[in-house]
């Protein structure tokens, strides 16, 4: 009997993406699997049921959940959805286990193997599975457009019959995937751009996009592709340099975020007060508490002279292509764990080991387990059991 891979309809209020698009469904079938979709799952992202060829469209969600060997989703599913899955099944979705402990417990207790897409390791061979990066690319692009529509001026220089209009000054803070895409987009739209990141190795990437790089003299390169926490002295040094650049910017996009953790503060109230009238900040860290003082997630607020936009789930605003990229990320993961139509989980494989959050009734992610069971329990389990002597 073939493995059944099913995608569900997302229930989040601001979620329009779907985990499976028609083209990818065809490629999954080539792996020797049956493919099913909850009725209407792709409509919000411009994929009607009729676009899914040779896919079982099922209206009974409970039946779909109980029969699927592998369940695909975008957002962390509810506990109720997990409890409706059959024991031994696999979930592939974003999980954010440190923030969704009830979900992880349900996965553990239901003996569901949970793959957390946000935990895909940042290694070369896993790039095609890196859902955080694929979604961040679209968020970075859209952030500049969002900022532009809130500005009282245009981005490019423009020559008119009555004179020339100056190009806007755009500062991108945080040059990860989202930041670099924002930088490239602002440059293509004609703005004068500069980028800042605490990791000096991003300097060349900024220059390659036609942008200046803000030099602070602080190196905060951390592990896993993310920046480390700055010391108090380093923060003061960085602030002194950045304040001038912030004050002269027309548009700032902040992108500093680490999945599942509080967003670092990049801009404070004093710096905002010295910004130009009509200036705009788009804070991509809004869901994690904000990179800017005064940011409100899901709202646009006026703070002194500046408008602060705190968008949530920007990839969902570009649902058609966000779904396409995410679905391809999942396909590449499935190709790692399905061979000749059979499930083959290699626990020694770095991608599998680091992406798993639960398996066989256990929490396999140490970081998540520490939050749920406590550091003492994790440490105790690492101590070998004493061996009886004859």
Model-derived regions: residue spans:
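Generic hydrophobic/aromatic pocket-lining and core-packing "Φ" positions
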Residues: 25, 49, 82, 104, ...
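An N-terminal-biased, well-structured beta-alpha scaffold segment characteristic
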Residues: 2-106
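Rossmann-fold NAD(P)-binding glycine/threonine-rich loop
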Residues: 98-124, 262-314
């Amino acid at each position: 009997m073939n493995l059944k891979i099913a995608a569900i309809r997302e229930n989040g209020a601001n979620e329009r993406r779907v985990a499976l698009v028609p083209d990818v469904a065809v490629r999954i079938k080539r792996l020797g699997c049956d493919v099913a979709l909850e009725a209407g799952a792709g409509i919000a992202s411009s994929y009607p049921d009729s676009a899914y060829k040779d896919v079982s469209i099922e209206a009974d969600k409970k039946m779909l959940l109980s029969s699927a060997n592998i369940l695909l989703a975008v957002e962390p599913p509810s506990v109720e959805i997990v409890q409706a899955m059959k024991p031994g099944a696999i979930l592939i979705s974003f999980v954010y286990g440190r923030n969704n402990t009830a979900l992880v417990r349900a996965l553990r207790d239901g003996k569901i193997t949970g793959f957390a897409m946000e935990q895909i390791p940042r290694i070369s061979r896993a790039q095609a599975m890196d859902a955080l990066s694929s979604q961040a690319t679209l968020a970075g692009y859209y952030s500049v457009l969002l900022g532009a529509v809130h500005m009282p001026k245009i981005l490019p220089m423009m020559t008119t019959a009555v004179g020339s209009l100056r190009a806007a000054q755009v500062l991108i803070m945080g040059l990860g995937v989202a930041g670099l895409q924002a930088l490239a987009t602002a440059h293509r739209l004609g703005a004068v751009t500069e980028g800042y990141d605490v990791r000096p190795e991003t300097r060349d990437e900024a220059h390659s996009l036609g942008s200046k790089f803000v030099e602070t003299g602080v190196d905060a390169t951390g592990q896993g592709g993310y920046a480390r926490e700055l010391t108090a002295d380093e923060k003061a040094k960085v602030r002194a340099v950045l304040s001038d650049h912030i004050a002269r910017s027309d548009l700032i996009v902040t992108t500093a975020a680490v999945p599942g953790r509080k967003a670092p503060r990049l801009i404070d109230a004093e710096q905002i007060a010295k910004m130009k009238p009509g200036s705009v900040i788009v804070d991509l860290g809004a869901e994690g508490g904000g990179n800017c003082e005064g940011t409100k997630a899901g709202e646009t607020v006026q703070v002194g002279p500046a408008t602060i936009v705190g968008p949530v789930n920007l990839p969902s605003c570009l649902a058609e292509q966000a779904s396409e990229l995410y679905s391809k990320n999942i396909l590449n993961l499935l190709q790692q764990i399905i061979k000749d139509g059979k499930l083959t989980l290699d626990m020694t494989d770095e991608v599998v080991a680091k992406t798993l959050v639960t398996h066989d009734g256990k929490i396999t992610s140490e970081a998540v387990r520490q939050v749920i069971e406590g550091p003492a329990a994790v440490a105790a389990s690492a101590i070998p059991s004493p061996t009886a002597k004859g």
